[in-house]
Design a protein with these regions (language model features):
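Conserved PLP cofactor-binding pocket of PLP-dependent enzymes
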Residues: 1-5
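Conserved C-terminal structural/oligomerization subdomain of aldehyde/semialdehyde dehydrogenase
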Residues: 6-143
Length: 143
């Protein structure tokens, strides 16, 4: 007795890397798959980094440790939460910091003390108890 929308778990196989579900932030059980030639790996990483204006979560699956490390490093700004060989829906607030960047947010990490930094303005205060009598900095003088 309520109205609303429900998305059945959906898998989409596309030949277009700019397909709508590849570019948009969809909150539902939707997995879009784009197959690529492994010889195009370098260009594919650039494509992944530039495909979407959103950057909430992302994941990569693979066995090649060097490729996984390269993807992690090169896709630094493509996902606020980046998963390697794990599902990209596993963040539990209070157990793992969670937050995205780009159009997905300010990359504040809810569930961690880092989130507090968005709400404060840091300031340094220095008080001297032994008043200096010399205005010069001896270490700046020529030898």
């Amino acid at each position: 007795d309520s109205e609303g929308y429900f998305i059945q778990p959906t898998t989409i196989l596309t030949t277009d890397p700019k397909f709508k579900t590849m570019e948009e932030e969809i909150f539902g059980p939707v997995l879009t798959i784009y197959l690529y030639d492994p010889a195009d790996w370098d260009a594919i990483i650039d494509l992944v980094d530039s495909t979407s204006q959103y950057a909430l979560t992302g994941c990569i699956m693979g066995k090649n440790k060097e490729a996984l490390a390269e993807a992690k490093d090169r896709l630094m700004h493509a996902a606020g939460n980046f998963y390697i060989n794990d599902k990209p829906t596993g963040a539990v607030v209070g157990q793992q910091p969670f937050g995205g960047s780009r159009a997905s947010g300010t990359n504040d990490k809810a569930g961690s003390n880092l989130n507090l930094l968005r709400w404060i303005s840091l300031r340094t205060v220095k008080e001297t108890f032994d008043t200096p009598t010399d205005y010069r900095y001896p270490f700046l003088e020529k030898d």
